Amino acid sequence: MLFSNQNVGVISVPIRTALHLSSWALSAALLWAGASEAQVSLSPLKIEVKTNRGQAQGVINITNTSNETFRARVYAESFTYNRDKGFESLPSSPSDLRPYLQFSPRELVVPPGTTRRVRLNARLAPSLPAGEYRTMIFTEPLKPNTVKNGNGITTNIITRVGSAFFVRKGDVRPNLMVDSVRWNAEAKKIQLLVRNSGKASAYTSIKWTLKQGGTVVKSGESPDTGIVPDGDRNLILNQSKKDELALSPGTYQLSGELLWGEDNDKSKLPFKLDLTVPGGNSTPSPTRKRR
């Protein structure tokens, strides 16, 4: 998002949460602006725990790999994953963990080459129903990075990075299903609509193959993407440059499997659907999963 006031521009760098990466360096956004700042990584980017006697704990590690001291504040936001846009902050929600969460420190100083920990402690009230309670823990520099371009315009870069904290009360788990597939002709992307009818979030990756008449057109893998309970996501299968497609009108066969859960306890769901690519300017209807 870009804000400008006369000769001063303030940029809030779009939020990156740990959905596709095992770590995320704040310096990526700062270097994009031509700045040289502290390189800071956050791990883990996703914490999933079950309550034990109503309590759950977690730890976030913030590491400074640069030669400059990093000063930041730590805060929490309620969130969901929007069907098309992904991460979305919420003022509050029934699944908001914040009323039951304590964490410290809320401000920290990370000297070069060191790691600081943020400790999370959730205490769920006995009266709360079984389910998932979640929040995003953000780390944000106390001072924005200021850069000046060749025209003398000053820009402030504010970067934040988040770790998702999921606390589950009771025996709750995700339940994914593939609903439909459609071809986005304008973006030249395959969109797979996946629903989660369970009571816990899931981060699913997808292995997929597209065929026409028995001939393989393209195969690929899509990275983990979060889907909240009773929610759905339009997942883009061919995200990367190497997976770009230019499909001719016709009917194609899309098959593959969803994979989610821990490495030692993966859940798998195979799927097989027809994908119709219309001719001309007609808009394709989503193709539902074969029953």
Could you say what each language-model-derived stretch is?
Residues 2-25:
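Bacterial N-terminal signal peptides that target proteins for export
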